[in-house]
Amino acid sequence: MLVTPLLLVTLLCVLCSAALYDSSSYVYYYQSAFRPPNGWHLHGGAYAVVNISSESNNAGSSPGCIVGTIHGGRVVNASSIAMTAPSSGMAWSSSQFCTAHCNFSDTTVFVTHCYKYDGCPITGMLQKNFLRVSAMKNGQLFYNLTVSVAKYPTFKSFQCVNNLTSVYLNGDLVYTSNETTDVTSAGVYFKAGGPITYKVMRKVKALAYFVNGTAQDVILCDGSPRGLLACQYNTGNFSDGFYPFINSSLVKQKFIVYRENSVNTTFTLHNFTFHNETGANPNPSGVQNILTYQTQTAQSGYYNFNFSFLSSFVYKESNFMYGSYHPSCNFRLETINNGLWFNSLSVSIAYGPLQGGCKQSVFSGRATCCYAYSYGGPSLCKGVYSGELDLNFECGLLVYVTKSGGSRIQTATEPPVITRHNYNNITLNTCVDYNIYGRTGQGFITNVTDSAVSYNYLADAGLAILDTSGSIDIFVVQGEYGLTYYKVNPCEDVNQQFVVSGGKLVGILTSRNETGSQLLENQFYIKITNGTRRFRRSITENVANCPYVSYGKFCIKPDGSIATIVPKQLEQFVAPLLNVTENVLIPNSFNLTVTDEYIQTRMDKVQINCLQYVCGNSLDCRDLFQQYGPVCDNILSVVNSIGQKEDMELLNFYSSTKPAGFNTPFLSNVSTGEFNISLLLTTPSSPRRRSFIEDLLFTSVESVGLPTDDAYKNCTAGPLGFLKDLACAREYNGLLVLPPIITAEMQTLYTSSLVASMAFGGITAAGAIPFATQLQARINHLGITQSLLLKNQEKIAASFNKAIGRMQEGFRSTSLALQQIQDVVNKQSAILTETMASLNKNFGAISSVIQEIYQQLDAIQANAQVDRLITGRLSSLSVLASAKQAEHIRVSQQRELATQKINECVKSQSIRYSFCGNGRHVLTIPQNAPNGIVFIHFSYTPDSFVNVTAIVGFCVKPANASQYAIVPANGRGIFIQVNGSYYITARDMYMPRAITAGDIVTLTSCQANYVSVNKTVITTFVDNDDFDFNDELSKWWNDTKHELPDFDKFNYTVPILDIDSEIDRIQGVIQGLNDSLIDLEKLSILKTYIKWPWYVWLAIAFATIIFILILGWVFFMTGCCGCCCGCFGIMPLMSKCGKKSSYYTTFDNDVVTEQNRPKKSV
């Protein structure tokens, strides 16, 4: 027996922060010859403890245990068991330890000691102070190992492992074999020195950390968070970041969705037709000499036996030895096709004597049943009994049937049709293996009928909707009450990620809102502490920066807590004043131009689950993928680093640009320019009107008036203005008009004039002219007013319709502009769409579906095909990672540009020409847009140009001094000449003015200084003959082949937002709205005050006098003026009232008496 020395490493500890059970322990075994390089390795077997028990004594009340015997076993049926004594150990004596053993199915391995002659039934007597480790099978010892007690002074542990049936004594390997079998039972036989602790274990995968060939740390692949993370990425050391993972659960259920609810199957019916043998001769004597014809033997299936020719034959019933004999067949040949079942069936016909022919054929074993028929044949058939062999009997037809009972063969008259009903028992809300309309896979099925039925999906007899990878996304089943829609979801959340912060596994990010989670950006965070999920806590702490892992604006600390990242710059930033409060004067030679500019400031982050993308749910593919090493880790590290940089750069960008609390734009005092909204605003006015007293004392009548009515009211103002009514008449478009309202005074005046004109006939007839004239003028007024009202109604309707059309056009233009922004955003996902489309590519394999490949081919061929898919899909992921890197670099540059635009264009006024819009910058207003910012630049651009003569500078040559030069100072402009005179003007605006001392810089010389160099100093300047372009081109473009990169593999277009045309259209719509202002014919409201009649004023006067008399009577007749005297302030009355009231006193008996006042002494 080959025994390989093994090293036992026992690690009994709590699994740090990722422990699944508080009392978890495990044992890790590996060969001592295994010396891997330093680092983490998925090697060997670990055994996790699943049950712990103890025992103090199993020798009973006897003074000791019996050495050399096996006793005290317990059934375990486990991968491993460890039986350990106390740390001090147990003595090798019958008073403490006797035997320890393990049963591996039919093999038993044990350790014992026995020093008695004829007292050791299994091992025989051993040498003193030696131990025996033996293995036996079927009661026969086939392995013996004798070791000294000096090596093992006491018994401490006995461990059995199914891996190569390894057995360890006190940690040393003492037995192994080439078989791997679970431990069925084990035990320790002892009297004292215990207790013995039994640890039953199950085998799990393990990731071990080796240093110099020795395992220093072990992580169990047991489904715990730490085990899932470590065993999926083959490492136990993780840098801060996010790590997607898949927790594949064991699928125990399976269902099939059939295309048809029922299937009809028509089986083949085999027809056997029998006929009368016309040339058959009478049989010789003896039953064995009867010849058979037309033998038909049925196999499995359905059969029909046609005996139609028997219609001319007469059936002969059984009568002792005569006629038929078929007690084992309860049917006649006429009913043999009535659905009878057989395991075997053979039919043949013969011709023999009716006397005894059938009965002897059955007795002799030639048939199971025999049917006899008479056809009136001659008596030429010989007998079959021993005494009748030479006699002749009537010949008849004999039908032999040989059969056995069963169900392989069934008779029928017509081809049978069997209907199989298919029942779609769909398992919901659990991970299952499915076969949906012939497509197999694994998924989590949910019923989505309520949300999908209203959209008429798959209404035209469709069965399923496939996703980009070719798998079923939604399928429909015809139920009893209509269509039922189901959605296939991944068994596990493909977006779930482990969060590692400070080198520790602290939480999980998932797209599912689970109990105890808290929302971070667009994901839900679940904190993990000691391997368990904790309830969420509110985010209360703010940090200026995050040295750990961050997700958006949230910082995840090593203890799993969440803090909000608020940079200090954002807290101390002072908001600039962006309100426009002053009018900017622009020269007439310039135009105000509005320019829009879109800058992308953020990118969409992606989460890559490399293993899920490449292999899906295929376990075979995942095993094969282990050979590719850390390629997924490299891709993931690139994507994670991009996400981290994106978050930090985006926070820094907003901290340097967006002040705290500045979230609401202030648009007060902003002119609307040519967009006239005066119709929507209240125009302040102070119309001339009468006083409050006039409104109280007069009745006012309002009517629609003309623009001439104001002049009429001014003309008739005054006490006797009604007398000037006709004189104040006005003309409107050549017609004489008067307001249609006539007061009582005017009515009296014109009536009197009319009556007087009729008093003396023709002599006074001219007095009626004023009455007729004013009547015609007022009729003109009414007619013109009605005409203007009708015209204004037409203008209002036309203008309103035009305004509505302009508004609709404006909304359409705005929609197009927003659509272009949306297109920019949608283009960000083009590379993702291309990556997902790669799942449909087979990359040279027979199929793009991994499950189909493994179903169609054997393991070796399938692995070769899947290897092509893995290589192709990894290439797609690499392209995606590279594209995101390039996009991040571009977006970072765009953010830098946006920062400059905000600082220079928004917060200040740029002096750079055409940096903030086109031309000289005036004002910039930023606006949030998807994934970026839209800047609206206001600038002024030249409209006309003046052709002037520019001069670099002046050289001054004084008479008594050396010459010097003057040039314009930086930023002051340039010198120009106009009509023989010299001026200075700004370079960007023509404003010539006299040159002053502050506009110039004095140079010491009028000469320009140059540096003289030769050709060898500046090698970048070459002559034409130094470079032969054709010669250089021929070095590259000759007959040789040069491989150029395939740029189609990386096609990423930088989106550019262009909404200039839409802004122009909106400007046109604004102009159209301005054109829709209604220019109404001016009308006025004429308000005429009518005075009350004279009797009304007389009644008012009488009422006032009566009121005064009653008030005076109350004052004098009450005896005491009461409060009225004081209130009205009538001092004399108050004094008199006071004197009068002192002479009278009212007593309780209501007797009024006069009192004498004493005289005053002076």
Swiss-Prot record:
Gene (name only): S
Residue ranges of coiled coil: 822-866, 1055-1083
Disulfide bonds: none
Glycosylation sites: 51, 77, 103, 144, 163, 178, 212, 237, 247, 264, 271, 276, 306, 425, 447, 513, 530, 579, 591, 669, 676, 714, 947, 960, 979, 1014, 1038, 1051, 1074
The protein's name: Spike glycoprotein
Ranges that cross the membrane: 1096-1116
Topological domain ranges for the Extracellular compartment: 19-1095
Free-text domain note: The di-lysine motif confers endoplasmic reticulum localization for type I membrane proteins.
Taxonomic placement: Viruses, Riboviria, Orthornavirae, Pisuviricota, Pisoniviricetes
